[in-house]
């Protein structure tokens, strides 16, 4: 499928990894512009990615009772990521010490990298197994709609 939603999620994970690296580099260099750019990515594209998972993918996987704890845990982690991102933004806006920003970024990066690894190892393989072509197309359409502002 040309616009496969599972592949899109995987690709976003790769992009998130790149942005996490950029965020780390900017934090250690005290590069406020670099921090702002990476944080903007996590406030927009990564947030939309989490919406794709929670609104379109997770509900379709809840039919497998064994996945429910994973799905609930991942959704909770999404809230934690958002809180950690806001904390970094507040530190940057408040012109905090570079070390304080770097420490907050390090926590965020570790948290998000572990989350991505868990999704790649558990969530996405489950989606590959469980979603038929019709369901994949429905998920893909919902994801496209989010990008068109619907």
What does each model-identified segment do?
Residues 1-150:
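Small-residue-biased structural context
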């Amino acid at each position: 499928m040309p616009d496969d939603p599972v592949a899109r999620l995987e690709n976003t994970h790769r992009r998130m990894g790149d942005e996490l690296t950029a965020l780390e580099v900017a934090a250690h260099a005290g590069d406020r512009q670099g921090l702002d750019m990476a944080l903007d990515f996590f406030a927009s594209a990564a947030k939309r990615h989490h919406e794709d998972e929670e609104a379109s993918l997770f509900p379709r996987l809840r039919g497998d009772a064994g996945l429910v704890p994973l799905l609930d845990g991942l959704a909770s982690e999404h809230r934690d990521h958002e809180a950690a991102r806001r904390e970094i933004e507040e530190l940057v806006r408040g012109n905090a010490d570079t070390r304080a920003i770097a420490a907050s970024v390090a926590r965020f990066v570790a948290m998000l990298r572990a989350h991505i690894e868990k999704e790649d190892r558990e969530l996405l393989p489950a989606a590959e197994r469980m979603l038929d072509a019709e369901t994949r197309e429905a998920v893909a359409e919902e994801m496209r709609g989010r990008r068109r502002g619907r």
